[in-house]
Design a protein with these regions (language model features):
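Gram-negative host-targeted secretion-system effectors, predominantly Type III and Type IV
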Residues: 1-175
Length: 176
């Protein structure tokens, strides 16, 4: 038995079925298009998997805010825990949908509202005209959600700055 198979079996024994399912949701690609588009193009399974991962991410954001907001301070651990589990892309997608849903809420900063409007979010109405994206709108207090998003955007910018020297180095090596 090689090391990879042994590791997979060990992981399967270590984690509960719920934890294994959660880990799988983290690796699901984001499906940007509405359910009707997915249905027409035979991509309904991808749509559903992405939707479930979005809901799980929303729950993780709510839990992180609840667990890491103390004494009027949102700990950086809140953002790090969600980003570590779901990555920047899904976390930012769920937050963009949340901000767009709360567009008239003054507790969301103008900066975050402008950012959300620039994200590729498609309306996803059901047969009754209700927006399906609301299923993964963050439920935490809008002011705390705004703080969380501000920190996510800051962390994303910092991670891009860290990658910049590496990218420049790779580019110069390619030009040689």
């Amino acid at each position: 038995m090689n090391m990879t198979v042994r590791t997979i079996k060990t992981d399967a024994q270590t984690y509960s079925p719920a934890q294994q399912e959660q880990a799988q949701k983290c690796n699901v690609p984001i499906y940007l298009y509405p359910g009707a588009y997915a249905q027409r193009h035979g991509e309904i399974e991808e749509y559903r998997a992405s939707r479930q991962a979005n809901i799980a991410c929303r729950d993780a954001i709510d839990a992180a805010i609840r667990e890491h907001f103390r004494d009027n301070v949102l700990s950086k651990k809140a953002v790090q825990s969600v980003i570590g589990q779901y990555g920047f892309d899904r976390t930012m997608y769920v937050l963009a949908v949340t901000v767009l849903d709360k567009d008239g809420d003054g507790r969301i900063s103008q900066s975050n509202r402008n950012w959300a409007k620039m994200q590729p979010i498609f309306a996803d109405p059901d047969d009754r005209g209700n927006e399906r994206n609301r299923a993964f709108v963050v439920r935490a207090h809008p002011g705390l959600t705004d703080l969380f998003l501000r920190e996510v955007r800051h962390e994303k910018a910092a991670s891009l700055e860290k990658k910049m020297p590496q990218m420049k180095k790779q580019k110069s090596e390619m030009e040689r």
